[in-house]
Curated annotation (Swiss-Prot):
GO terms for cellular component: TAT protein transport complex. NCBIfam families: tatAE. HAMAP family: TatA_E. It comes from the Bacteria. One of its GO terms (biological process) is protein transport by the Tat complex. Gene3D superfamilies: 1.20.5.3310. Residues 60-103 are annotated as: Disordered. Belongs to the TatA/E family. This is Sec-independent protein translocase protein TatA. It is found in: Cell inner membrane.
Length: 103
């Protein structure tokens, strides 16, 4: 009496369920339960694969760390080029002037 789920109690419960629902309905319910278990296992497997794919993608993102290069606007670059060009032009004039003085 201490154990509620003894084998004899389970058999009696199964017989009552069989009588109430009928043989066809019980087999249909068991089929539905089996389909549910299969669908659950399939979804768990797909979820595991998605998790593995995400982990692989995160590994790739760590290895391909691309940093953007800083660039200056064109107006700043052109101004810098003009300064360089004008200073070399001035240096050229100065060297020509020195040569002429030396003569």
């Amino acid at each position: 009496m201490g154990n509620i789920f003894s084998p004899t109690h389970l058999i009696v419960i199964l017989l009552i369920v069989l009588v109430l629902f009928g043989r066809g309905k019980v087999s249909e319910l068991m089929g539905d339960v089996a389909k549910g278990i299969k669908a659950f296992k399939k979804n768990m497997k797909e979820e595991g694969e998605l998790l593995e794919d995400k982990l692989e993608m995160s590994d790739y993102s760590k290895t391909t760390d691309v940093r953007p290069q800083q660039s200056q606007p064109l107006s700043v670059k052109r101004a810098a080029e003009r300064r360089k060009g004008s200073s070399s032009f001035k240096e050229g004039k100065a060297s020509v002037a020195k040569k002429q003085r030396g003569k």
